């Protein structure tokens, strides 16, 4: 039996998208480019060393000139090339004014190449940019184009970057993030398990807000992960293992007395079903920029809502705050990072520019993606916490 609220959601979404669907212009241009931002200091997450952050920026232009954009980390994969060579032409051909129908149709036509990796990242960004363009054509935000209203979501700050910082360098940033309006903070794994724990203890010792941790795929076994965090009163523990370690997640969840979450950057169409159907997690980590865009979130809405699992959204706050306002699953956290932190340096640059008066036009995803050269520098640290609002 379908929940009455979910039935109402389905009706609202279908009605809103169908209204004027035939009047949505065809896509004139669809393209992507890669932007690389060199980091001021390397980010070391266990064995994962990041010296630059590569982004794919997708632009969709409708025949009337309405333009939508999206961006996301490409993790060193050829996302922009995949959009330009594999996705752009069939997507333009299929597009019927409804991004959700188009997403479903292109997946059914080309599921083999589009179901994972760089191509799914590319399709996800194309989907988001198309929703942005359609909303701008309508003169609305993306939320409004779905017949919905913006909700207030808990804003969490990602602190403690670069992870080489010691525990003595944590308390000030927790205080700054809370002063800027964050309701909680999340710290990445430190240089070694001992420092990871000491950094968490330093954040908890402030007593200012809940604290969570991203173990960033640094552990091999449930016991190893448990030993890092045991006894700490954390809001949640996140991403302890590389993707594929479902059995270890189930075992770690059994050991922990705090919530377990996982799923960052898992770019395949078995996410989040693999977690939900194995009972591996207490909370989902979702990233629409690599897991199917807004359209897949809408198509999975009833399934995810019925799972009763809350969602912690992975960075890209401007995009995810609107998606979280559209779907029915409860949002536990929307996260953002400070200019100069090098967590999501393009989003940090957008936030920094906004503080300097470079604002968006209030339409679509309310993003003003800067026109950067192919190679540029990320903002230098230390992190400068400013009010998200």
Name what the model sees in each region.
Residues 5, 10, 340-389:
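C-terminal extensions of enzymes
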Residues 227, 244-362:
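Shared catalytic-loop signature of beta/alpha-barrel
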């Amino acid at each position: 039996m379908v929940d009455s609220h979910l039935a109402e959601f389905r009706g609202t979404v279908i009605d809103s998208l169908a209204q004027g669907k035939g009047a949505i212009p065809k896509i004139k241009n669809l393209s992507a480019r890669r932007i690389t931002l060199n980091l001021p200091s390397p980010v070391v997450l266990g064995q994962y060393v990041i010296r630059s952050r590569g982004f794919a920026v997708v632009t969709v232009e409708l025949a009337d000139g309405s333009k939508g954009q999206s961006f996301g980390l490409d993790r060193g994969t050829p996302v922009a090339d995949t959009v330009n060579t594999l996705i752009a032409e069939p997507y333009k051909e299929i597009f019927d004014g409804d991004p959700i129908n188009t997403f479903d149709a292109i997946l059914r036509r080309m599921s083999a190449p589009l179901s994972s990796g760089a191509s799914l990242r590319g399709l996800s960004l194309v989907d988001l940019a198309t929703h942005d363009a359609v909303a701008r054509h309508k003169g609305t935000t993306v939320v409004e184009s779905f017949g919905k209203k913006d909700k207030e979501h808990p804003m969490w700050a990602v602190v403690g970057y670069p992870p080489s910082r010691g525990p003595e360098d944590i308390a000030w940033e927790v205080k700054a993030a809370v002063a800027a309006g964050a309701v909680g903070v999340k710290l990445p794994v430190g240089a070694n398990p001992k420092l990871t724990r000491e950094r968490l203890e330093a954040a908890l010792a402030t007593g200012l807000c809940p604290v969570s941790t991203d173990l960033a795929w640094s552990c091999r076994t449930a016991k190893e992960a448990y030993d890092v965090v045991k006894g700490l009163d954390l809001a949640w523990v996140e991403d302890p293992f590389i993707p594929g370690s479902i059995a270890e997640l189930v075992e770690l969840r059994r050991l922990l007395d705090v919530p377990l979450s996982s799923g960052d950057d898992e770019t395949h169409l078995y996410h989040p079903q693999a977690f939900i159907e194995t009972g591996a997690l207490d909370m989902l980590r979702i990233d629409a920029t690599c897991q199917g865009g807004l359209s897949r979130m809408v198509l999975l809405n009833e399934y995810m809502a019925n799972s009763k699992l809350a969602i912690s959204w992975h960075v890209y706050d401007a995009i995810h705050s609107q998606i979280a306002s559209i779907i029915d699953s409860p949002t536990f956290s929307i996260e953002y990072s400070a200019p100069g932190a090098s967590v999501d340096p393009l989003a940090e640059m957008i936030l920094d520019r906004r503080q300097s008066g470079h604002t968006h036009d209030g339409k679509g995803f309310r993003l003003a993606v800067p026109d950067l050269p192919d190679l540029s520098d990320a903002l230098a640290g230390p992190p400068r916490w400013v009010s998200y609002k």
